[in-house]
Regions:
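Catalytic core of non-heme Fe(II) oxygenases with the double-stranded beta-helix
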Residues: 27-38, 43-141, 145-146
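Non-heme Fe(II)/2-oxoglutarate
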Residues: 1-41, 144-181
Length: 181
């Protein structure tokens, strides 16, 4: 497995492009509630490469010290038909989930989960990985806020933003974020 140099001129452009894409993705923002993110890694794995079963570090270095890793993500940059093997396998809540999604798809999962990358048997697997410290430390609180955010988006299709139901839901979401933080 090889890592791209994201400090080079071209690497900085790639890093900034990836960070902008994540910042503009409402589902990612609602699910992760990012407080801060680790440095991104762009990883290329060729035939014979993989990454064994492991759990991510509880803390990662950031500019001003360390951050807690609540969530991990893998953003797939290669189309699945361009390589064989290379599935991301996550063990979470007694289940094993294996995924090899399309280019541009992102898998967000608890950093506390055991996971691995199956051996790539042909072609090249290209991904971006990163870690998030959430504004909402507890997973169950993040899930409740995510559900309410989705409910708000659904209700917004049929209700004026200034309607009592939408204002109450907006107030409730904001107050829960304050409480959970």
């Amino acid at each position: 497995t090889q890592q791209a140099d994201l400090t080079s001129r071209m690497g900085v452009k790639l890093r900034d492009l990836l960070l902008q894409a994540l910042a503009k993705t409402p589902v990612f923002q609602a699910a992760a509630q990012p407080k801060q993110m680790s440095r991104l890694l762009v990883s290329r794995t060729e035939a014979g490469g993989g990454y064994g079963l492991h759990v991510d570090n509880a803390f990662m270095p950031v500019r001003d010290g360390q951050m807690r890793t609540d969530l991990s993500f893998t953003l797939f940059l290669s189309a699945p038909e361009t390589y064989d093997g290379g599935e991301l396998v996550i063990e979470h809540s007694g289940q094993t989930i294996s995924a090899k999604p399309g280019a541009g798809d992102l898998i967000l999962y608890p950093s506390t989960s055991l996971h691995q990358v199956q051996t790539v048997t042909a072609g090249t697997r290209l991904v971006c990985v990163g870690w998030i410290e959430s504004q909402i430390p507890r997973a169950d609180d993040r899930e409740a806020l995510f559900d309410l955010t989705n409910l708000k988006a659904e209700l917004a299709k049929d209700h004026d933003p200034q309607s009592p139901i939408m204002l109450t839901l907006s107030k409730t979401l904001a107050n829960l974020k304050r409480r959970f933080n």
